[in-house]
Regions:
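Long, structured stretches of catalytic cores involved in phosphate-ester chemistry, encompassing
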Residues: 1-202
C-alpha cells in the first residue's frame, strides 16, 4: 500500500519499485523476440555453454505435468518441450536442472528415456513460500506419473520421483557440490523440513 501511495516504509518502496523496473525492462527486451527466437537462443545456450551444471529456470512447470487442464505450464506446449528434450538427449548434454514453481507444492523428480540410459534431466520445484487458503497444496496425486511425459518413435520420456512432495509453505536452499546438488526444503522460519541429494553426471 505504501508503494502504491508513493510513501516510504524503510526500503520497501525502493525494493518494490526496483522489482517493477526490472520486470518492465525485461518485458521490453523480450517483447520484440519471437517464440522461435527465444527457443533458438535457449537451445544454443544448452549446446554451447561450457558450464558443467546448467540451471534452466522457468516460472511454470516443465515437468511433471499437473492433472488439471490448465494452460499456464509447459504441458500446453508439448511440441516445444519435446524439441528441447530431444536437443538435450541428441547432444548428450549432462546435468540440466530445471528450477520451477507455481504448483503450491515442492518436489524433485527426474526424467529418463526408455532407449537411452544416459539421458537424464532433473527438476527442482520450490513453491509456495506463502500459500493462500483459497489454493490447495499439491500432493503426489496432483501429478501425472502413470504415463510417459512424451512418446516418440525413438522411445518414451518417463518420470521418476526423487523426493516426496512438500505440501506446506516452504522454500528451497540449494548447494552445488562436485557429485550432487543438495536440496533442502525449509519452512517460512527457516527450519528444516526435508532434504535430498540429486546426483550429478560426472
Amino acid at each position: 500500500l505504501a508503494a502504491l501511495r508513493g510513501t516510504r516504509v524503510g526500503l520497501a518502496d525502493n525494493w518494490l519499485r526496483h522489482v517493477h523496473d526490472v520486470k518492465l525492462r525485461h518485458r521490453r527486451r523480450l517483447d520484440h523476440l519471437s517464440v522461435a527466437e527465444q527457443e533458438d537462443a535457449l537451445i544454443s545456450w544448452l549446446i554451447n555453454s561450457p558450464a558443467r551444471v546448467k540451471f534452466l529456470v522457468t516460472s511454470v512447470m516443465f515437468f511433471p505435468d499437473n492433472k488439471d487442464n490448465g494452460t499456464d505450464a509447459w504441458k500446453a506446449f508439448p511440441e516445444q518441450r519435446l524439441r528441447i528434450l530431444d536437443t538435450i538427449r541428441k547432444h548428450r548434454i549432462k546435468n540440466v536442472i530445471v528450477v520451477t514453481g507455481d504448483v503450491h507444492g515442492s518436489l524433485t523428480s527426474r526424467l529418463r528415456h526408455s532407449e537411452d540410459a544416459d539421458f537424464e534431466v532433473q527438476t527442482i520445484v520450490s513453491s509456495p513460500f506463502c500459500n493462500s487458503a483459497l489454493l490447495p497444496y499439491a500432493s503426489a496425486s496432483s501429478f501425472i506419473l502413470d504415463q510417459p511425459l512424451a512418446q516418440t518413435e525413438s522411445g518414451d520420456y518417463h518420470l521418476e520421483w526423487t523426493s516426496k512432495v512438500i505440501s506446506q509453505d516452504n522454500f528451497a536452499y540449494l548447494e552445488v557440490e562436485r557429485e550432487h546438488i543438495r536440496v533442502e526444503y525449509r519452512d517460512r522460519d527457516g527450519e528444516h523440513l526435508y532434504s535430498v541429494n540429486l546426483p550429478l553426471q560426472l
